[in-house]
C-alpha cells in the first residue's frame, strides 16, 4: 500500500512537467503549427513517421484539356486551309469553313442557300459569321418544327374528314345555298381588272427604295413584309393606286428579297418597278414627299399630286434621313396631322408602310380624316380630339363642293 502511494505521488508530481519532457511533437495533420504552439501543446507527445515521398502521385487524365487542345488544333487547321484556298475559290472555302464548324459540334444549319453563303462571306469577323450561322440554325429548327406541326394538323384534318359522314352531296349544298358563291378565281380576275385600270388611269403612289444601305438585314426583311401588305391592301381597294417601286436596284438586297417572297408572281404584279428615281418620272412641282420630320402639316388629300413614301424601317433611330433627301432634291414635304386630330401619348410619329397606304386610300376615297386615322395604332394615342364647330362647317363645305 505504501509502495502504491509512493508511485501515485511520483506520477502526480511529474504530471505538470510532461510537456517539458518532449518539447517538439510531430503531428501529421498539424504540420503548419509554429514552434511555440507545438511547445505549448497539451496533447500527449507522439512521434509520427514522415510521409513517404518516394511513391509517385496518381496521374489524372484531363479530358477537358485534351478536348480543348484538339479543338484548337482543328480550328487552326481550318483557318489555315481557308486562308490557303481563299484566293482560289471563296465559295468553296466558305463551305469548307461551315463543314469544319459542323465537325466541331457548333450550331450550323444542315442546308444553306447560295444567297446565305454570299451573306456569310460578307461577314467581317469570325464572331459575325458565328452569330449568322447560329441565326440560320435557329431559323431552320423553327421551320422544321412548324412543318411537323403542319403535317400533324393535316393528318388530323384528313382523319376527321374520313370519319365524318357527308349527308348531302356538293350539288345539294349549292342548291341549298341562298347566295351565289364567289369563287377565288372570280375575285382574282376582278381585282386584276382594277389593278390594270389603276396602271392606266390611277393616281401614282411612289415607294422610294433608296434606303437599303441604311438598314440592317432584319430591318430590310421587315420593310419587304410591309411592302407586301401594302400591295395587298391596295389591290383589294375599290379605287387602287398605281404603285411605283422607284430606285429599286436590280439584284440589290431589296430586289432579291422581293423576288424571294413573291417567287413566280413577281413578274405578274400590276405595278411598276424601276431603277429610275421618282424625280426622273414625274415633275418636281407635282411630288410631295411624306415624312414624319416635315414641318409642313398635311391639310387635305390632293388627287393631282404624286405622294412619295420612303421604304425605310428605322430601328437604329436615324431621324431626318428622308427629310434631308427630300431637301437635297428640292421636293415639297408634308406630315400627317396627328397632333391635330389625336391625343398623342407615347412614341414617335413614324408609321409602317401598310398603315400609311391604308390612311391614304381612305383619304382618297372619302377625305374623312377621322376615319382615315383609325389605322394609327391605338397604343400611341388615347383617342380623337373634339372637332370644333368651325372645322365641322369647313368639312361640310368641302363635301358639298365635292358633290
Swiss-Prot record:
Name the UniProt record assigns to this protein: tRNA methyltransferase 10 homolog C
Molecular function GO labels: identical protein binding; RNA binding; tRNA (adenine(9)-N1)-methyltransferase activity; tRNA (guanosine(9)-N1)-methyltransferase activity; tRNA binding
InterPro entries (UniProt xref): MT_TRM10-typ, MT_TRM10-typ_sf, Trm10_C_MTase_dom, tRNA_m1G_MeTrfase_euk, tRNA_MeTrfase_TRMD/TRM10
UniProt-listed CDD domains: Trm10_MRRP1 (cd18102)
Main location: mitochondrion
Subcellular location per the Swiss-Prot or TrEMBL entry: Mitochondrion matrix, Mitochondrion nucleoid
Coiled-coil regions, chain positions: 138-169
Keywords: Coiled coil, Disease variant, Methyltransferase, Mitochondrion, Mitochondrion nucleoid, Phosphoprotein, Primary mitochondrial disease, S-adenosyl-L-methionine, Transferase, Transit peptide, tRNA processing
Gene3D superfamilies: 3.40.1280.30
Family, as annotated: Belongs to the class IV-like SAM-binding methyltransferase superfamily. TRM10 family.
EC class of the enzyme, as a word: transferase
Superkingdom of the organism of origin: Eukaryota
